[in-house]
Amino acid sequence: MVEKLERIISQSQNIVFFGGAGVSTESGIPDFRSVDGLYHQKYDYPPETILSHTFWEERPEEFYRFYRDKLIVKGAKPNAAHLRLAKLEREGRLKAVITQNIDGLHQAAGSKTVYELHGSTLRNYCVKCGAVYDVDFIANSTGVPRCPKCGGIIKPDVVLYEEGLDEQVLSGAVSAIRRADTLIIGGTSLVVYPAAGLIRYFRGDHLVVINMQPTNADAEADLCIAKPIGQVLSEDVVLDD
């Protein structure tokens, strides 16, 4: 199966990668929906409640306590999947990474064209004056983080439940998928909409799914591999001419 994947990659000139939480689990970042992910851990409120715009507005101290504890992951490094995708971009084969992750690991690996559908924990801004702050400012603050310049609340640039996706990011992602000759879907269960709905714009030659569990794209895929994506993309395969 990996040999078939490498053959598809070698024949492609416009690859787009669409990824989710499973891409970063090998970097030590938990998958929200896996058996041992955030959705199966015990809190006073379910994560989808805490990570909502309403909760952020009404219970900001609890929101930021959870956010610092569970969403800011210190010391995470790009894994083999991130590094291989960045390499494919440098080689000119991969044109874009579309990610549902908020950890910035694709950019840390060297990827340049990355559409972050759900934003990034690395960017934070004052809701009052617009001043920008890095992740360390949030991590090192206590209680509700406040802007030193104006006193406004500093909000992570992540898409919370009840919030819409960024239109420019969406547009760029759709355009990339429409132009792709190969779409590789990796580390995502394809259950979060509207993000998962973007794959319907693909009209290219090869659809590949690399995910530990079945997805609703499997039936249309040319190739499905049920292995950790870092393992798959790091395997050395020599293709016969």
Predicted regions and their residues:
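Conserved catalytic core of sirtuin-type NAD+-dependent deacylases
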Residues: M1-D241
